[in-house]
Amino acid sequence: VTGIEAAEAADDSVSAADAIGWLHEEGLTRLAALGSGSPNPAVAFSVDVSTGIVTKYPAANGGIGADSSTVAADDLPAPLDSSNRLVVVGITSSDQILVVDLAGSLVIGINGDRPEAAARSWVMQLLLNPDITVTTNSADVAIGSSPRCRKSFIPGGGGSIVSVDDGNPPVTTVSMNSDVEGSDYLDLLGDGTGEMYLGARVWPLRLVMTIGDTAWSALSETLDRAAG
């Protein structure tokens, strides 16, 4: 996984890698519990690598109660049964791990020369939740014969898209280099950095989590065998 490998190579690699590991072990399920416990559900979270402070971001257009709030990681609520549609997007320029709840967007874009690299990272994280099924019209993202990440014709799907369904409608559509400009999207800047936009909010990212072709080929082959 290119993003994790790059994090391990950075000066603060151990703490960044540990934070990402904690998120995938239990942190995402605890963030899911935090995000679901208010009238203004969170659309994103950031976890400060050095302090462990978690910032919760409701939708920027949520009106009253839409301001961000903070809590220590140790004070997060007990985990839910799943991480819902939370994905680790990358590491911000201020050394915070950015987590986005894809359930907060009907359509969210990934733009850049290789948008499928970031889409693969999201898909692999989403598949950790057994309730999620991914459908895509992109051969660069589908996993062989896996019923949980299959390639299929998607009506109305102009361009490459990924549909994320956890049984709780509406589904989230991830579009890659779409001609339709939306308010929620990740811009890949070509050097491993990027910018995440959710409505009026933006997070500069010094590292975007991606999965390159070689790693994806090995992962998809393993998952394809498991599905068979």
Predicted segments — roles?
Residues 1-228:
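Accessory regions of macromolecular translocation/handling assemblies
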